[in-house]
């Protein structure tokens, strides 16, 4: 149990309500959940000792799927060769599936303790325990055994319970006793599922009530518990279960059913309750620009942020009061695509324009002055970024080049390098937060890494993982992870390989020879939520990232504590700027989020 991350009980209080069916569908739905960055590793522990149904629900039996021992304990029966869903049930230990279990309480308790302590699950994201009906000794033994086995590795032995009922009053009456049991045992109830809420006609797909309706919802309202959803009786789902064989791939078969689509909503509600409700609240909306807003940028040290626009102006605001501090305009002749604050303790702002010029603006005394104009690009400047100590400024352009400028002691700027490895428009540049490592992304779908090798700035790594334009790049605050986003709506996470052994064992996307300095690999792909290009990404902290783009949606992702490569969608904010696209996101230091869109507005959000 030391490698099991979440433990969930499925309870009913009454037999015959389809608890094992809900357990099965919850496990299958979690495995294929779209809110995670990979399929989840899930275990099902069937502790309904006198009526073990889980083997049959997965098309397994004791004749062909016997439990065997390893040095670590009992090895589960897996649904397929991926070993992503494991099963443990007394049904696998009986000589015949027709054998009855006629045991007294002490023997049942001993079997439950052995199931909890002796099964070698390996690394599991979720362990779902299918419990027997009622609130008797078996339930107490489950809770006590989990507490005993997990007390040294988990703060809470059970993450929560899902309670299953049917609509009838006789079922909800018994479920109320189960609710009281959870209260006395200090088990959090994640929600109520109403099973058998209707009957789906196999011919016309209409759903008809065959019992009373709304019992589960009424129960949830009475006890102020989350209502996860209703599950109708679908003959096609029953037919699928009946036709399963030990060789059937239930994961694939279930994903094709209508029930899987219905149950995915229940699973999403379940996850919302497990992680806690999260949302983005609008703090304020800031207007003033007369064209689309291209970028937002927060000063890393001072209470200032800047916005830039198609209207050729930059507006600077106090991030505490949201009052307008200054407007920079009149210098640039075309849209201002990007602004970036120099990371020093005075207000110096770089401004990049489609007029191919980058201006450096600084507050001197009580006024803002343009102290330098950097020229050299042949076309629109698309992005600018300062190095971690503010010594270097990188600029990139539609002319396919990346320029690196050095700020001298007298605040002049010298061009150190013109990098021309990209074969198309360069969309974005960003620097590592603690090293002089520059990364660029392009319309040619590639990501390039650059370092000063002592004589010049050299290309040290080139990644070809994207199959469309790379619009956004951002390092995590600790610098260990690089996030990238593209025109297909993908958000990838990349990590640096630290040893020669790692280099030898991965399929590298670096097209340069391995002897060069940098070797990065794709760690994971975040859940594909966006329906269109992702133009902007921003880190709140090392475990929280947000993205936005052409679909007008802001998505917040969070990393699981037990697996750095496993991320889930924490929240989706649809229509964050109405019907308009979102071009820029940036977190302020206190975790407020700035967003800028084609509506010309900057919105300030709080993530709760």
UniProtKB/Swiss-Prot annotation:
Cofactor(s) needed by this chain: [4Fe-4S] cluster
Location(s), subcellular: Cytoplasm; Nucleus
Keyword flag 4Fe-4S: yes
Cofactor note: Binds 4 [4Fe-4S] clusters per heterotetramer. Contains two stable clusters in the N-termini of nbp35 and two labile, bridging clusters between subunits of the nbp35-SPAC806.02c heterotetramer.
GO cellular component: cytosol; cytosolic [4Fe-4S] assembly scaffold complex; cytosolic [4Fe-4S] assembly targeting complex; nucleus
Gene3D superfamilies according to UniProt: P-loop containing nucleotide triphosphate hydrolases, YVTN repeat-like/Quinoprotein amine dehydrogenase
Pfam family, one: ParA
Binding-site residues, ATP: 13-20
InterPro entries: CIAO1/Cia1, Mrp-like_CS, Mrp/NBP35_ATP-bd, NUBP2/Cfd1_eukaryotes, P-loop_NTPase, WD40/YVTN_repeat-like_dom_sf, WD40_repeat_dom_sf, WD40_rpt
Superkingdom to which the source organism belongs: Eukaryota
Record family assignment: In the N-terminal section; belongs to the Mrp/NBP35 ATP-binding proteins family. NUBP2/CFD1 subfamily. In the C-terminal section; belongs to the WD repeat CIA1 family.
Name the UniProt record assigns to this protein: Probable cytosolic Fe-S cluster assembly factor SPAC806.02c
Further remarks about this protein from its record: Results from a fusion of two genes coding for two proteins which both play a role in assembly of Fe-S clusters in other species (CFD1 and CIA1 in S.cerevisiae).
Residues in WD repeats: 288-327, 331-371, 376-415, 421-460, 465-504, 529-567, 576-608
Entry keyword Iron-sulfur: yes
